[in-house]
């Protein structure tokens, strides 16, 4: 069956999606398994929604039910052979099983039945299979759309609701499945022995981690026997009423060694508790012993002594730490004699004295600027780590936490920075480490630092104390403390250096030129500054005197420092001076602080004159902590763009994915915004032109001896637009994390930036951000009038694009502006949009123009309201769908025999009394608005120069909804009758009727041919749209997979990507217009049939009257006396027949007919009884005569009415036919123009995508 379906030539080209093909393009629709499905959809298509799987899945995947079979069945075969598969993908949206709304997220959950009574759940753009399905699946909804039917077995113009999903509701497996395992990741330098050793090392590491996670407290929790054996004894040992160790709980002065001894006594008691618990004489002693052995077997290399030691220390931490704090904070008056180890060296006063100490004053053997930056960065990180000792959280109030902090601090100081190390090969020797630790301790300002060190040294386990690395760390820290003690000779030097730094920095911030001059003059004659001089000092963040001068924002201070001696500050000192915390250099700091332009230009001049171009590029594009370069901060000083813009990497992204050009466009509060973005774009264009010219020059230097035109142009500086190396801005590199492009974020100045007008710019004006907003939608949403004017002038614009998730169009966003912006600005935006619509989507020569903009749902009335605008009016009252139905009904009633579409046909796809899925609510109204606008366009085309279009539009513009429909119906009926009466006396002869009939027969043939032509055209257009969609989807997938990063992505990526799914094409809308012409022609055809039926009735009446007249003549004249020749000559003329009827019939002209009946009087004579049978026969003859006269009078009345109706209808149809001939030409021309414009826009977009692809290929 499926094979026959695909080889048959009796249907239109096969659709790529086989499920749609088997429903809408099936020559065997009246046979199983399609018959029941098609019949149900034919009669109730508004009550069903078709779930459409990805065409890629249907063609490439197979049915999971046949996975284990030798003959696997492709899913596309199920579309032609399996009725269950087809019915399972059609849901009854007209009658949902249940519908609920979640209380918090307000998501709507709706359960529907399929055509074969299975259940599916729709929730948050996802579909879930339920009752009746063999597999429970969760599938992503990619899009929703309407499918235009083109087949003859569905009603003409019917549209079906589609929900596109990533796979089928039956599931699907890739047809080609790789059976090869993934190759292991190997190191080519490793041998098999090395691999084995690595695995052993990994195993040992895992065991170590496993053992380190074990604590004695966990053992007590996990093994109740052990807890019962030792738990109570440990509780008594640590209890505060334990008088055996009362000395640790009393805050009295004592030596630190005494505290240490007391701790070890308690530790010995703890060990004794463990040993006593495993003695044989103890209850459960043997069981405890076996348990401990079992624990050791579970955790190899477990040190139980260490666990007990840590357990004791943890329980005594508060007691021990409070004792240490008390002893160290005791006055130092006699500590030298009583207990020198308890002397507090690092006091608050000393921290204050050394607060401005700089690394260059500690005799560090490293003096390169980039090396010092790396050291300062390490110091800052180490300070932040060491400061954790000052916190009193539970994570730092343990011995293990203190040790970890010390370890981390040393690691930070001795290892390169994790993020962008400035000197990764830097070697830290012992002297350097001492200097780094001094800076770290001095600036961390940890109170009671000595107490922390004593605690670590005195209360650690024996294996830790004996560790060589740990011992070296602690001895180094002791040396630092000793170096900073009052007994050390170098302390005064450090304090003096810190004081000099403080004086210099204070003088700079206080703008004390006298003090600064004094400091500068003291070494003015020196060729080089000493490395320890305060002018080379830096704070903990790496900021030096020049940075402070920029922040002081005083040109005299800056020049005094920089020009004091040219040899004092080299170009390296200037380039590498930066804040190591934020990684911001001097120029960044100047821009952020908005330093005076004179200072900035002087600094820029210094860099330009002394640094190479590569050094400048590296300097300007250096990124700070937030990923921003100088280019991101150029909006602080716009004049720098023209000076260094050609050296800026405009595609460099910060952590917010903003490029420098993107940042310029987002400076909405800049007073000179247009000049700012113009300067930025011109700098980018200049940079691109230089790249192109360099490329052309390289071609010239490496090419043949003959100098080509391109080489000449490059030599002369001429820009070559058609060169392969030419390119504009790569806008894909300027998209932020929300999907916004430069066109989205720019506030104004589109003409000045040439973002749209520059031919080399590969920009998509209709690109959507991740919220599905196009630039046009954003301009309307945020009231950007200037940008709106610019983008409306671009012929690539998709004006009627909709948000695929909410289905909002541009007029919906226009309606959101009310109350948010100035009324005048909103009116200007509205005027621009309405003018654009009428100039591009409405017949230009139409005198009356009306457009339906958008729809809104009113919860109070539970109805949708359609908003309208006329060309010369502003605010109009919206019409509800109920009112709209009344208007169209009354319009058709007023013009019953025109080409105006019948109301039932117009509302064929919009049964408002039938529910649908929440995803289709707005889409259905948008589709109705589209159809309504086609109605307005057709009326305007059909009645150019006629007032009837204005009459229809006035029904939409006026507020007469209060008038009852029945009253209006009566008025319209009376008006039509009045029009008939105005025709006056109507006389139709047989010849006239025959002429009308001949005219109608000719019109009938012509209309049938025309309708047949438009029917074929509409079919071709509608199926052409499906082929357009198929081709676009395949091309989208191809371009998507051509990307190197996506080429080897799994199949599922293609089916889940919403951006690869197209659901409409330019031929679809064109098909709607062709269908409209066809429907209008069928309306006219129906009217021709109506008058043809009236003419046939007129003929029948005429024949009946003729027969009655003949019978009447036979009663009035004897048979032999009837004239023969004259009688035969007058048979076809009713007037003659009436004249021969004697005195009982006469010709009486009326307003309605040529013939009527006079008063018929039967002789009132008395019948004599003697006459007998003759009187009886005479009475019977008179009765029959009277009946014939009455019957003839009734027929004459009917034919009189038909005379009026035929003449009235003939005039209307003649007029309508003439109008239709003009209308179909105008409307076809208008719709073709719309189609061509839309197709050109679509082709421009595809051309843009291919150009982007070629650009990526060339630059890959």
Curated annotation (Swiss-Prot):
Please name one Pfam family that this protein belongs to. VPS9
Instruction: Provide any one GO MF term from the record.
Output: SNARE binding
- InterPro entries from the entry? Ankyrin_rpt-contain_sf, UPF0507/Ank_repeat_27, VPS9, VPS9_dom_sf
Q: Which domain of life does this protein belong to?
A: Eukaryota
Q: Which residues form the VPS9 domain?
A: 336-493
Gene Ontology cellular-component annotations: early endosome; late endosome; plasma membrane; transport vesicle; tubular endosome
An example GO BP is: early endosome to late endosome transport
Q: Which family does it belong to?
A: Belongs to the UPF0507 family.
What is this protein called in UniProt? UPF0507 protein LELG_01076
Q: Which organism is it from?
A: Lodderomyces elongisporus (strain ATCC 11503 / CBS 2605 / JCM 1781 / NBRC 1676 / NRRL YB-4239) (Yeast)
């Amino acid at each position: 069956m499926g094979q026959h379906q695909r080889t048959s030539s009796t249907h239109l080209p096969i659709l790529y999606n086989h499920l749609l093909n088997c429903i809408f393009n099936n020559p065997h629709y009246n046979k199983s398994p399609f018959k029941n499905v098609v019949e149900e959809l034919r009669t109730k298509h508004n009550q069903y929604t078709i779930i459409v799987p990805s065409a890629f899945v249907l063609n490439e995947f197979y049915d999971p039910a046949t996975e284990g079979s030798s003959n696997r069945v492709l899913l596309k075969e199920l579309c032609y052979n399996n009725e269950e598969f087809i019915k399972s993908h059609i849901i009854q949206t007209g009658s949902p099983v249940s519908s609920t709304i979640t209380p918090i997220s307000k998501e709507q959950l709706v359960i529907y039945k399929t055509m074969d009574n299975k259940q599916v759940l729709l929730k948050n753009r996802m579909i879930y299979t339920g009752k009746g399905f063999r597999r429970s699946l969760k599938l992503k909804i990619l899009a929703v759309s309407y499918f235009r039917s083109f087949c003859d077995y569905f009603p003409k113009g019917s549209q079906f609701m589609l929900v596109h999903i990533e796979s089928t509701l039956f599931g699907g497996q890739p047809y080609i499945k790789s059976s090869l395992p993934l190759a292991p990741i190997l190191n080519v330098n490793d041998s098999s022995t090395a691999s084995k050793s690595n695995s052993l090392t990994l195993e040992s590491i895992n065991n170590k981690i496993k053992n380190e996670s074990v604590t004695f407290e966990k053992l007590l929790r996990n093994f109740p026997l052990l807890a019962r054996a030792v738990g109570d004894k440990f509780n008594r040992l640590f209890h505060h009423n334990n008088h055996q160790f009362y000395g640790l709980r009393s805050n009295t002065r004592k030596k630190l060694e005494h505290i240490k001894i007391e701790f070890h006594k308690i530790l010995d008691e703890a060990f004794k508790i463990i040993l006593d618990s495993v003695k044989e004489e103890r209850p459960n002693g043997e069981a405890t012993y076996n348990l401990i052995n079992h624990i050791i077997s579970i955790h190899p290399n477990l040190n139980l002594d260490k666990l007990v030691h840590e357990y004791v220390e943890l329980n005594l931490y508060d007691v021990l730490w409070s004792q240490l704090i008390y002893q160290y904070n005791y006055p130092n008056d006699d500590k030298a004699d009583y207990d020198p180890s308890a002397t507090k060296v690092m006091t608050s006063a000393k921290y204050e004295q050394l607060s401005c100490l700089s690394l260059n004053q500690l005799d560090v053997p490293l003096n390169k600027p980039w090396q010092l930056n790396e050291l300062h960065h390490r110091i800052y990180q180490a300070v932040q780590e060491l400061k954790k000792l000052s916190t009193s959280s539970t994570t730092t109030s343990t011995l293990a936490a203190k040790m970890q902090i010390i370890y981390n601090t040393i690691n930070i100081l001795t290892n390169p920075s994790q993020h962008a190390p400035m000197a990764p090969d830097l070697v830290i020797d012992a002297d350097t480490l001492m200097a780094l630790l001094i800076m770290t301790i001095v600036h961390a300002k940890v109170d009671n630092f000595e107490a922390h060190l004593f605690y670590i040294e005195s209360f650690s386990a024996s294996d830790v104390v004996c560790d060589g690395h740990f011992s070296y760390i602690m001895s180094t820290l002791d040396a630092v403390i000793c170096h900073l003690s009052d007994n050390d000779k170098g302390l005064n030097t450090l304090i003096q250096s810190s004081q000099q730094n403080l004086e210099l920095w204070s003088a700079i911030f206080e703008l004390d030129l006298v003090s600064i001059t004094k400091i500068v003059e003291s070494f003015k004659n020196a060729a080089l500054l000493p490395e320890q001089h305060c002018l080379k000092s830096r704070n903990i963040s790496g900021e030096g005197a020049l940075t402070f001068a920029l922040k002081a924002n005083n040109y005299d201070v800056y020049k005094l420092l920089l020009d004091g001696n040219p040899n004092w500050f080299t170009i390296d000192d200037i380039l590498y001076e930066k804040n190591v915390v934020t990684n911001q250099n001097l120029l960044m700091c100047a821009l952020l602080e908005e330093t005076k332009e004179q200072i900035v230009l002087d600094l820029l001049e210094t860099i330009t004159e002394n640094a190479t171009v590569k050094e400048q590029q590296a300097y300007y594009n250096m990124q700070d902590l937030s990923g921003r370069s100088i280019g991101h901060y150029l909006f602080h000083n716009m004049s720098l763009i023209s000076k260094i813009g050609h050296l800026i990497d405009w595609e460099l992204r910060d952590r917010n994915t903003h490029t420098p050009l993107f940042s310029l466009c987002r400076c909405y509060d800049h007073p000179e915004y247009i000049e700012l973005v113009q300067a930025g774009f011109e700098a980018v264009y200049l940079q691109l032109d230089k790249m192109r010219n360099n490329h052309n020059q390289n071609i010239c230097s490496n090419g043949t001896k003959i100098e080509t035109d391109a080489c000449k142009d490059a030599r002369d500086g001429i820009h070559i637009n058609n060169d392969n190396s030419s390119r504009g801005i790569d806008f894909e590199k300027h998209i932020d994390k929300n999907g916004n492009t430069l066109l989205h974020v720019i506030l104004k100045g589109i003409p000045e930036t040439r973002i749209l007008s520059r031919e080399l710019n590969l920009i998509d004006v209709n690109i959507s951000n991740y919220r599905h907003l196009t630039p046009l939608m954003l301009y309307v949403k945020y009231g950007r009038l200037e940008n709106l004017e610019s983008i409306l002038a671009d012929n690539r614009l998709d004006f009627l694009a909709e948000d695929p998730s909410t289905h909002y169009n541009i007029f919906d966003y226009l309606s959101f502006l009310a109350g948010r912006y100035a009324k005048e600005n909103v009116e200007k935006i509205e005027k621009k949009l309405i003018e654009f619509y009428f100039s591009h989507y409405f017949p230009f020569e139409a005198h009356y123009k009306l457009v339906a903009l958008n729809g809104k749902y009113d919860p109070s009335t539970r109805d949708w309201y359609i908003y309208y605008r006329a060309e010369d009016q502003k605010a109009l009252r919206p019409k509800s769908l109920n009112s709209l139905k009344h208007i169209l009904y009354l319009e058709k009633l007023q013009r019953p025999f025109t080409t105006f579409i019948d109301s039932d046909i117009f509302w064929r796809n919009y049964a408002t009394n039938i529910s649908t899925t929440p995803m289709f609510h707005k889409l259905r109204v948008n589709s109705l608005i589209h159809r309504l606008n086609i109605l307005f366009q057709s009326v305007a085309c059909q009645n150019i120069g006629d007032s009837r279009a204005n009459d229809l539009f006035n029904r939409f513009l006026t507020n007469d909804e209060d008038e009852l429909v029945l009253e209006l119906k009566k008025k319209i009926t009376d008006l039509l009758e009045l029009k008939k009466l105005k025709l006056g006396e109507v006389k139709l002869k047989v010849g006239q009727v025959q002429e009308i009939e001949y005219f109608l027969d000719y019109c009938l043939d012509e209309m049938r041919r025309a309708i047949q032509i438009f029917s074929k055209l509409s079919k071709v257009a509608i199926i052409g749209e499906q082929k357009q969609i198929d081709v676009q989807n395949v091309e989208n997938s191809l371009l998507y997979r051509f990307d190197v990063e996506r080429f080897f992505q799994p199949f599922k990526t293609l089916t889940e990507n919403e951006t690869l799914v197209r659901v409409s094409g330019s031929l679809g809308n064109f098909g709607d217009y062709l269908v409209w012409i066809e429907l209008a022609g069928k309306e006219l055809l129906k009217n021709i049939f109506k008058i043809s039926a009236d003419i046939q009735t007129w003929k029948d009446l005429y024949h009946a009257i003729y027969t009655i007249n003949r019978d009447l003549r036979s009663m009035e004249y004897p048979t032999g006396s009837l004239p023969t020749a004259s009688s035969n000559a007058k048979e076809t003329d009713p007037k003659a027949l009436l004249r021969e009827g004697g005195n009982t019939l006469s010709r009486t002209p009326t307003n309605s007919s040529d013939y009527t009946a006079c008063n018929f009087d039967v002789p009132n004579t008395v019948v004599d009884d003697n006459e007998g049978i003759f009187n009886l026969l005479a009475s019977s003859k008179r009765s029959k005569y009277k009946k014939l006269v009455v019957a003839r009078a009734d027929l004459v009345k009917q034919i009189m009415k038909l005379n009026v109706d035929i003449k009235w209808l003939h005039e209307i149809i003649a007029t309508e036919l003439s109008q239709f001939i003009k209308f179909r030409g105008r409307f076809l021309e208008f719709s073709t123009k719309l189609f061509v414009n839309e197709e050109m826009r679509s082709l421009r977009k595809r051309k843009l995508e291919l150009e982007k692809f070629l650009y990526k290929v060339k630059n890959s």
